[in-house]
């Protein structure tokens, strides 16, 4: 207990022993600790193993070539995005590893990333795969759930809490992690002019994100939710957290095209050029002013200096996603059915049909698994009850007629 105005003997909040000639007590903010407990805490911290990243020297950080090679094992296509992200991640962690070095007193600023691409193009997968290669904590946040402080919804600090939780409570490790903020385009302000009214889920959220993206010491409620007076807070330094923001930015290509073309209205050749180039405009010509016109505030654009546009996945890309990556969807289901002694076979036309369905549904790679799950439902229900070796063949007819009740997904024959 703490001494108030009287002469009460102080007690250590950790061991409970009283202050005497040999045991000295230090107090502050409602707690106290003795010199013996301080020594024990120091020993614990000395013996505690630092994270892999904390031990990683500049020479041990994977090079951009190594990072891209790792991405190639799990992500199909998006070659430009892989190269840009590999360089950005390498430079970021090289900066983190070298912060203790005084390089001509030059302060290297953080280069966060903005990914622009349609739904299902691989934005989240790219960020997650890189975090796995770097062996750092990773958290995903949905920008549409965030609101300005004081309004119903999530505070931006809750993003940091997710990262700390994914680091098993290790704040120091979380401070070297990666955060992916999805749907960043959905919090664009209503116009490029400064708002005179509250926009708590748009411009207000962008303003709230500024500090943590740039780098600050944020106070995070350990249990989540809103901050309360006298509440204990986690102090998280975001200076070394890499932020990757992503969004579809529907309509941005039109803004870019209008600026690039000298004659956007009428029947001139420039209009045809815009239609033919499509997403190529996003790769080559998008500038910060285009993003401002879309609705991002200039300050947040300045804190996302690395911008890259992802391609819409083609039918061939989607087909390759089904079979080529190390954790491809078809490989996963083959392993799953093998546990029930079932040999799973997809013919080439079936793979094409599944890819076409994903294109028709405009879900990209994200929709592939749900399509295959629906195809496999009856087979997964029946297979465990069937004894002996079995084979399941998925043909184009199965894919295109899977909604018909008369279609049987399991085709049996003697092995």
From Swiss-Prot:
The organism's place on the tree of life at top rank: Bacteria
Residues binding Zn(2+): 12, 15, 34, 37
Pfam families according to UniProt: AAA_2, ClpB_D2-small, zf-C4_ClpX
Binding positions for ATP per the UniProt entry: 118-125
Boundaries of every ClpX-type ZB domain copy: 1-53
GO cellular component terms attached to this protein's record: HslUV protease complex
UniProt keyword list: ATP-binding, Chaperone, Metal-binding, Nucleotide-binding, Zinc
Any one biological process term the GO annotation gives: cell division
One MF term in the entry's GO annotations: unfolded protein binding
Free-text function comment from the UniProt entry: ATP-dependent specificity component of the Clp protease. It directs the protease to specific substrates. Can perform chaperone functions in the absence of ClpP.
Family: Belongs to the ClpX chaperone family.
Subunit structure comment from the entry: Component of the ClpX-ClpP complex. Forms a hexameric ring that, in the presence of ATP, binds to fourteen ClpP subunits assembled into a disk-like structure with a central cavity, resembling the structure of eukaryotic proteasomes.
Listed name of the protein: ATP-dependent Clp protease ATP-binding subunit ClpX
Species name: Treponema pallidum (strain Nichols)
Gene that this polypeptide is encoded by: clpX
């Amino acid at each position: 207990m703490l001494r108030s105005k009287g002469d009460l003997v102080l007690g250590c909040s950790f061991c409970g022993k009283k202050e005497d000639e040999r045991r000295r007590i230090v107090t502050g903010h409602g707690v106290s600790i003795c010199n013996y407990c301080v020594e024990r805490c120091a020993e614990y911290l000395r013996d505690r193993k630092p994270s892999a990243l904390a031990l990683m020297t500049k020479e041990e950080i994977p090079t951009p070539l190594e990072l891209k090679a790792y991405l190639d094992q799990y992500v199909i296509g998006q070659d430009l995005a892989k190269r840009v992200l590999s360089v950005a991640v390498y430079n970021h962690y090289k900066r983190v590893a070298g912060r203790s070095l005084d390089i001509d007193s030059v302060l290297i600023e953080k280069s966060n990333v903005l990914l622009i691409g349609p739904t299902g193009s691989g934005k989240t997968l790219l960020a997650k795969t890189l975090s796995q290669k770097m062996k750092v904590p990773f958290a995903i946040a949905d920008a549409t759930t965030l609101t300005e402080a004081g309004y119903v919804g999530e505070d931006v600090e809750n993003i940091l809490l997710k990262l700390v939780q994914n680091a098993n409570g290790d704040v120091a490790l979380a401070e070297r992690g990666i955060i992916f903020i999805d749907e960043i385009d959905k919090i664009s302000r209503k116009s490029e002019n400064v708002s005179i009214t509250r926009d708590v889920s748009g411009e207000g959220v962008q303003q709230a994100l500024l500090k943590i993206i740039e780098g600050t010491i944020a106070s995070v409620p350990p249990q989540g939710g809103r901050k309360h007076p006298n509440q204990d807070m986690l102090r998280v330094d975001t200076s070394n957290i890499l932020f990757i923001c992503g969004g579809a930015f529907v309509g941005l290509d039109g803004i870019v095209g209008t600026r690039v073309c000298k004659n956007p209205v009428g029947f001139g050749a420039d209009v045809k050029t815009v239609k033919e180039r499509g997403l190529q405009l996003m790769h080559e010509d998008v500038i910060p002013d285009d993003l401002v016109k879309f609705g991002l505030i200039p300050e947040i654009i300045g804190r996302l200096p690395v911008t890259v546009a992802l391609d819409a996945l083609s039918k061939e890309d989607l087909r390759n996603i089904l079979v080529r990556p190390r954790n491809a969807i078809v490989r996963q289901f083959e392993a799953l059915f093998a546990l029930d002694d079932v040999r799973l076979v997809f013919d080439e036309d079936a793979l094409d049909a599944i890819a076409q369905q994903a294109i028709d549904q405009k879900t990209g790679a994200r929709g592939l698994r749900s399509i295959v799950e629906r195809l496999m439902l009856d087979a997964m229900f029946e297979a465990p009850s069937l004894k002996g070796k079995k084979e399941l063949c998925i043909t184009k007819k199965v894919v295109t007629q899977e909604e018909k009740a008369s279609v049987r997904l399991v085709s049996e024959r003697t092995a």
